[in-house]
Amino acid sequence: MKRPDYRTLQALDAVIRERGFERAAQKLCITQSAVSQRIKQLENLFGQPLLVRTVPPRPTEQGQKLLALLHQVELLEEEWLGNDTGIDTPLLLSLAVNADSLATWLLPALKPVLTDSPIRLNLQVEDETRTQERLRRGEVVGAVSIQPQPLPSCLVDQLGALDYLFVASKGFAERYFPNGVTRSALLKAPAVAFDHLDDMHQAFLQQNFDLSPGSVPCHIVNSSEAFVQLARQGTTCCMIPHLQIEKELASGELIDLTPGLFQRRMLFWHRFAPESRMMRKVTDALLEHGRQVLRQD
């Protein structure tokens, strides 16, 4: 049975996390040549490449499995050592989350764990359609995703759904939709997307107004909170979670442009199996808060 040296695995992990050999060497306080040698030792042990040497480097499928193993072992080891010695060593938990969850329900959900447990969070923000890939690559130990199916050796639970409304300010609606939201009016109304892979706005318009992708002027802004600000100041129409703008809707600062029409995103919590005690606390906190604030039907 091939048993990797965890020191060499940490070199592979550092190259992925630091996005290159030079920064990985600095992180590990060794030479760049030593990093390369450790990874070569791993590749010789398993008889195949573990790293695709692109910019930035990325792990192969076997490399992903080894990184996932490393993170599981590190989490269990740190937790066990802390509990056994009485030293509250903060556990590093790397989680992949979508920006809208981070801006709405996720941090309140984690408050009990952050208050009562010695952990350090590394929250990696990614679109909910792609967070599971970070778990697959071994970059994180848990992920909030829209994918219902678990990866091999992983667990999954349904969290609940975010409902996205098509909203804008009253002034924006009067300017761009004086006769209501029509197909022709939408072609001139500026919108916003999180990045070039964010297709929620386009999917909503295609489904309800038969508008093809790319037909609507669209800003790219990598901030969930900025969506709200852009809508409030009357410069764009946006797809925003109802949970994020309850006050603005109640006050009339923002209006629902298409009452009865919305996009629903069901969210799922993925993590490696078996769960450590600390990850079980995180899971329980997310599921409990999700049942309270996310749509369950």
UniProtKB/Swiss-Prot annotation:
This is HTH-type transcriptional regulator ArgP. Residues 4-60 form the HTH lysR-type domain. Homodimer. It comes from Serratia proteamaculans (strain 568). PANTHER family: HTH-TYPE TRANSCRIPTIONAL REGULATOR ARGP (PTHR30579:SF2), TRANSCRIPTIONAL REGULATOR (PTHR30579). One of its GO terms (molecular function) is DNA-binding transcription factor activity. The keyword Transcription applies. Residues 21-40 bind DNA. Keywords: DNA-binding, Transcription, Transcription regulation. InterPro entries: ArgP, ArgP_gammaproteobact, LTTR, LysR_subst-bd, Tscrpt_reg_HTH_LysR, WH-like_DNA-bd_sf, WH_DNA-bd_sf. The keyword DNA-binding applies. NCBIfam families: argP, PRK03635.1, PRK13348.1. Pfam families: HTH_1, LysR_substrate. Controls the transcription of genes involved in arginine and lysine metabolism.
